[in-house]
Swiss-Prot record:
Domain of life: Eukaryota
Principal location: mitochondrion
GO cellular component: mitochondrial inner membrane; respiratory chain complex III
Species whose genome carries this gene: Cheirogaleus medius (Fat-tailed dwarf lemur)
Protein name: Cytochrome b
The encoding gene: MT-CYB
Amino acid sequence: MTNIRKTHPLMKIMNSSFIDLPAPSNISSWWNFGSLLGACLAIQIITGLFLAMHYTADTTTAFSSVTHICRDVNHGWIIRYIHANGASMFFLCLFIHVGRGMYYGSFTMLETWNIGIILLFTVMATAFMGYVLPWGQMSFWGATVITNLLSAIPYIGTVLVEWIWGGFSVDKATLTRFFAFHFILPFIIAALVMVHLLFLHETGSNNPLGISSDSDKIPFHPYYTMKDLLGLLFFLILHLTLVLFSPDLLGDPDNYTPANPLSTPPHIKPEWYFLFAYAILRSIPNKLGGVMALVLSILILTFIPMLQTTKQRSMLFRPLSQILFWILTADLFILTWIGAQQVEYPFITIGQMASILYFSIILIIMPTVSLMENKMLKW
């Protein structure tokens, strides 16, 4: 009798994706972050659903409803903090996942890479809109500042901003539509994840060596299901430690003050995972230039496959490229730090230098160094 998982129309798809999937035998723990992102998405959708049952998307009651969730709803406080810190864990896994793709040359799988970039933009949009919902000071002013950037678009900018706001300022209409989008986008993300996996399974996974693994495959289950479960265990330990011991560590104290359009916080800044892009935005004195740099800071990932000059796919045996990769990582840490600082000397200068370095490494230095490595290896 044939196994049901190989014949049933639905189970057949699951089987070929997660059980009998031929996987390279040498993929390391850096490949765990894909499954962790799936776990993050599931956690966010489930906790978000329970929060939406008690939340009210109205400017007069939004802040109170979040307080009500934390004080009066059974286990509401932990659901709220799992959701809020889940976003931070989501982005931590996302950044590592993208970094791994750059390091080991996974960007050569063009469809998978480009869908991944679309996913990154969608997750960023979802997180931004979610940050507005508690209707605290930083929620309100963050929404005002970031949406106002669209007014830099020539000719249609002002109309576009007022259209997004649903009026002449961030108000009830804005909050209602942001809640609607914040609710629907995770399901769109889930659909995009399916497309991401579809394209990934067309080519098969990359591996640390960056060479074809067709001659040495192992079934996904039990080897990588166990490995992913171990990764998930470590992830949950870190996540729950954050939730139970320091739930407000990554948040902003200003968001515990109800939104007040008449009082501007001394320093408007987004959540930590947007700070690097925010620092790049602020490092350019011109508004339109800043917005373009902000978009390019993520969109630049689409250029990486076109800028690849190396004959080796992975950076595993390319020490110069490795050094550059870690300089780029350090540069992103510096940009994140600068994004959280006041707009004053010396932070302005440091931010500008770090922004120039960020674009230079990706667009100029890395392709040049890769050509040098080809010469050194006589390729």
